[in-house]
């Protein structure tokens, strides 16, 4: 007869009808009993012949591919002009006085952030935009290009202009100006860009002029050089490799004039009329001469001055005869002026050698499950986390639940701030650019590669027949619809482009570490500036606590102004005021302790409602169930040990079958959640110790000892002794010399004992006592002779390694009606 739920509860000592604990509890460590219970509850029978279940409620398992949903009406989020001030350390020091070593070290890490991968694999441009939505290829292509363009305009990306130069928008940092080559550095102006052409540039322009025969253009460019902020950055360069003294591969715009002016030059009268200021040689494809040059006959660069060529794929359709009703020439003829082939950044800098390749693909998804109107760019730089050359990312401390509760469970009033686009605040050094490249090979290549009738193999790239190969009804209809959204930008986005990250990207394991360092340092500064308040952060989630609502509001104003003065962008619409119970990291934290948020409790309820019994569930689904239940496990009676059978099945990659008793047990566990309370400091007066054969307790001046009916493993014996001490004395601070008991992880003990011990020791704090000093050592060995002196062992609750560098003074418990003028806000705060 299988074990009923009622019997199981009694067995686990969850009911009060059990006999004396000293007799009952050691039974639960018995291997034979554990095996029988596992058989009764069907926990160990992992090999089943019935087919596995691969879906439970919203949890999907093996062999299920969730089809991503494309939204043609996605809005690209706007990015404010984010520019974190470079002198952030100086500004913090003005605000709060000298920074601690810890704060300085953390802030230096991100000014600028550096990225040193062991090895970088370059992928062809065709792989720049992933074909993530096969039904909506063209639509997805343009939305992604628009997103990338928005990021470039916001100063978050560099655009590769040539092998050694890049352009960007926004305010430059000093390291983007101090660009050195060899032993000499450039002479900087305030804008960080050379304003005077150097010797090399005039030499080089002569050199190119004689080679190309582009007199008229060269003269025009030479005249314009003086006024441009980004004149040519080449100069006499004495190295053994180039005895001529000229650096032909220079970073300037004219360096590859032959290929560039040829690559995307379009001489229509419309353009010259509409954009007289933009010289034709400036209209080259940023990055893409390597890709687009195939459209030219071999001698075209030389014959440039004799006859106009329009090799731009998009504009070639203007002069060609429509091949059908769905020919792209119909769309190209909709507009007289399609704008420039490439836009130019406000600043140009020299960068390390960057190939015309990408290092990761991008695609779009919903911004989050609650916001499907906006898109989010997913960047796949997973190459740096895989394979033999993977980078081991730095670890950083995240507070566990108990530390978080100790820190934040108080009678404070809370609000949380939302940092908009937090990752994009932290600048990356330009040397990281060659490793973090995204981009696309342009629409023509993208369509040709993905269309089945692609005839791109025969290398007749210049022929008109080949131009019309890409015309199709699908492409025509998609472009017509996109024309309404993007207008003239269709032309801009149809060109190849290569972009590198100027701020830290989300798809690299280094980014969360850097963000955590940054926000924790800023919160540390805020805590010291306002000693009676608490500021705490986890990644981009920043919370402020103060002892009354009025105090909190004035703190909010002061902190917001401080953060804005550093260049940190807050999203005022997403500031949430929580009152006295804070919602943070999935928990509700109040003066009574922490509990999971309501939406998580609701998910758990739904999960149990849909959980089948007597049906083998695929281990991947079990993994997802355990993920959800594991989050709330610390709030249940038996905690993590109750989930051990599920963990075992996941580890062996087998199916798990829920028996009605085990399901009822878990259901009951998760129906009543108990808060995890804040630990209080105190003095340890109860000590426990054990040997494999006996146990001993010391409670004040009272001593007890007992023996086990059979020898037990030492850790099991120590755990039993701790349970006896707790139940006998009721003390919530115990002294023990066993590190496993101290760690409070009872998952490696016999299953039944782990569950029962978790319930008995819930809310107990442990203090480590070295064996030699443990007063319970003698009783555990059966000696009740002269008593060892009781230790004076204080217990201090820990906040983990969340390094509150400056301890905040304790907050008085009374709540004033309003903020007094002698409030800590006015005493401690000095204007920046």
UniProtKB/Swiss-Prot annotation:
Region (Polymerase/reverse transcriptase domain (RT)): 336-679
Pfam annotation, one family: DNA_pol_viral_C
EC number: 2.7.7.7, 2.7.7.49, 3.1.26.4
Binding annotation for Mg(2+): 418, 540-541
MF-aspect GO terms: DNA binding; DNA-directed DNA polymerase activity; metal ion binding; RNA-directed DNA polymerase activity; RNA-DNA hybrid ribonuclease activity
Biased composition (Polar residues): 186-206
SUPFAM superfamilies per the UniProt record, alphabetical: DNA/RNA polymerases
Region (Terminal protein domain (TP)): 1-177
Region listing for Spacer, in residue ranges: 178-335
Every Reverse transcriptase domain range: 346-589
GO BP: any one term: symbiont-mediated suppression of host innate immune response
Domain notes: Terminal protein domain (TP) is hepadnavirus-specific. Spacer domain is highly variable and separates the TP and RT domains. Polymerase/reverse-transcriptase domain (RT) and ribonuclease H domain (RH) are similar to retrovirus reverse transcriptase/RNase H.
Protein function: Multifunctional enzyme that converts the viral RNA genome into dsDNA in viral cytoplasmic capsids. This enzyme displays a DNA polymerase activity that can copy either DNA or RNA templates, and a ribonuclease H (RNase H) activity that cleaves the RNA strand of RNA-DNA heteroduplexes in a partially processive 3'- to 5'-endonucleasic mode. Neo-synthesized pregenomic RNA (pgRNA) are encapsidated together with the P protein, and reverse-transcribed inside the nucleocapsid.
Note in the entry: Hepadnaviral virions contain probably just one P protein molecule per particle.
Record family assignment: Belongs to the hepadnaviridae P protein family.
UniProt-recorded name of the protein: Protein P
Organism, scientific name: Hepatitis B virus genotype D subtype ayw (isolate Australia/AustKW/1991)
Gene: P
């Amino acid at each position: 007869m299988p074990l009923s739920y009622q019997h199981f509860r009694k067995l686990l000592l969850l009911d009060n009808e059990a006999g004396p604990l000293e007799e009952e509890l050691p039974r639960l460590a018995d291997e034979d009993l554990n095996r029988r219970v596992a058989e009764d509850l069907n926990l160990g029978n992992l090999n089943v012949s019935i087919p596995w279940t691969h879906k439970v409620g919203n949890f999907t398992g093996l062999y299920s591919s969730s089809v991503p949903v494309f939204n043609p009406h996605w809005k690209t989020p706007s990015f404010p002009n984010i520019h974190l001030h470079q002198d952030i350390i100086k500004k913090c020091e003005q605000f709060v006085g000298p920074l601690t070593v810890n704060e300085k070290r953390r802030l230096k890490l991100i000014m600028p952030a550096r990225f040193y991968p062991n090895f970088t694999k370059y992928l062809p441009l065709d792989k720049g935009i992933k074909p993530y939505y096969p039904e909506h290829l063209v639509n997805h292509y343009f939305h992604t290009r628009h997103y990338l363009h928005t990021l470039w305009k916001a100063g978050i990306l560099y655009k590769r202009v040539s092998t050694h130069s890049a352009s960007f928008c926004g305010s430059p940092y000093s390291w983007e100006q101090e660009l050195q080559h060899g032993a000499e550095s450039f002479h900087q102006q305030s804008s960080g860009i050379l304003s005077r052409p150097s010797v090399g540039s005039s030499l080089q322009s002569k050199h190119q002029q004689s080679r190309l025969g582009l007199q008229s253009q060269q003269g025009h460019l030479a005249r314009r050089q003086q006024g441009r902020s980004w004149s040519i950055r080449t100069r006499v360069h004495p190295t053994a490799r180039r005895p001529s003294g000229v650096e032909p591969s220079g970073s300037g715009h004219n360096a590859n004039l032959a290929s560039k002016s040829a690559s995307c030059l379009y001489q229509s009268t419309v353009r010259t009329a509409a954009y007289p200021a933009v010289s034709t040689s400036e209209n080259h494809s940023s990055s893409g001469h390597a890709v687009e040059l195939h459209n030219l006959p071999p001698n075209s660069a030389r014959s440039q001055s004799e006859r106009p060529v329009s090799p731009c794929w998009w504009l070639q359709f203007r002069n060609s005869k429509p091949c059908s009703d769905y020919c792209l020439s119909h769309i190209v003829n909709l507009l007289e002026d399609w704008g420039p082939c490439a836009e130019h950044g406000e600043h140009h800098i020299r960068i390390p050698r960057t190939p015309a390749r990408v290092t990761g693909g991008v695609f779009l998804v919903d911004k989050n499950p609650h916001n499907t109107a906006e898109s989010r760019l997913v960047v796949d730089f997973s190459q740096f986390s895989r394979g033999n050359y993977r980078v081991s990312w730095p670890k950083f401390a995240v507070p566990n639940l108990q530390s978080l509760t100790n820190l934040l469970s108080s009678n404070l009033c809370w609000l949380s701030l939302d940092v908009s686009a937090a990752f994009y605040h932290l600048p990356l050094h330009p040397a990281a650019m060659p490793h973090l490249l995204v981009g696309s090979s342009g629409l023509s290549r993208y369509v040709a590669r993905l269309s089945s009738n692609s005839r791109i193999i025969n290398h007749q790239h210049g022929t008109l027949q080949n131009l019309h190969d890409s015309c199709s009804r699908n492409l025509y209809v998609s472009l017509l619809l996109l024309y309404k959204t993007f207008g003239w930008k269709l032309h801009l986005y149809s060109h190849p482009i290569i972009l590198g990250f100027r701020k830290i990207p989300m798809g690299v394991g280094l980014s969360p570490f850097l963000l955590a360092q940054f926000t924790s340092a800023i919160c540390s500064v805020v805590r010291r500036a306002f000693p009676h308040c608490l500021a705490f952060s986890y990644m981009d989630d920043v919370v402020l606590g103060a002892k009354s609502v009025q105090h909190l509001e004035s703190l909010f104003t002061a902190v917001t102004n401080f953060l804005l003065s550093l260049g940190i962008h807050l999203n005022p619409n997403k500031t949430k005021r929580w009152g006295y119970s804070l919602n943070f990291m999935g928990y509700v934290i109040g003066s009574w302790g922490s509990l999971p948020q309501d939406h998580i409790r609701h998910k758990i309820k739904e999960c149990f409602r849909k959980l089948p019994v007597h049906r083998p569930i695929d281990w991947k689904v079990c993994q997802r169930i355990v993920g959800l239940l594991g989050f709330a496990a610390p709030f249940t009676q038996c905690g993590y040990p109750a989930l051990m059978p599920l963990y075992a099945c996941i580890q062996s990659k087998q199916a798990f079958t829920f028996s009605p008793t085990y399901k009822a047990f878990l259901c009951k566990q998760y129906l009543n959640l108990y808060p995890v309370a804040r630990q209080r400091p105190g003095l340890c007066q109860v000590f426990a110790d054990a040997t494999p054969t006996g146990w001993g307790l010391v409670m004040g001046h009272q001593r007890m000892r007992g023996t086990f009916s059979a020898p037990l493993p030492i850790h099991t014996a120590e755990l039993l002794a701790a349970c006896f001490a707790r139940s006998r004395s009721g003390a919530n601070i115990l002294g023990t010399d066993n590190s496993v008991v101290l760690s409070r992880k009872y998952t490696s003990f016999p299953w039944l004992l782990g569950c029962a011990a978790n319930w008995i020791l819930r809310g107990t704090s442990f203090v480590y006592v070295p064996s030699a000093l443990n007063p319970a050592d003698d009783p555990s060995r059966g000696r009740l002779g002269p008593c060892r002196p009781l230790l004076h062992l204080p217990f201090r609750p820990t906040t983990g390694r969340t390094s509150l560098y400056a301890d905040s003074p304790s907050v008085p418990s009374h709540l004033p009606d309003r903020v007094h003028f002698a409030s800590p806000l006015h005493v401690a705060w000095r204007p920046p």
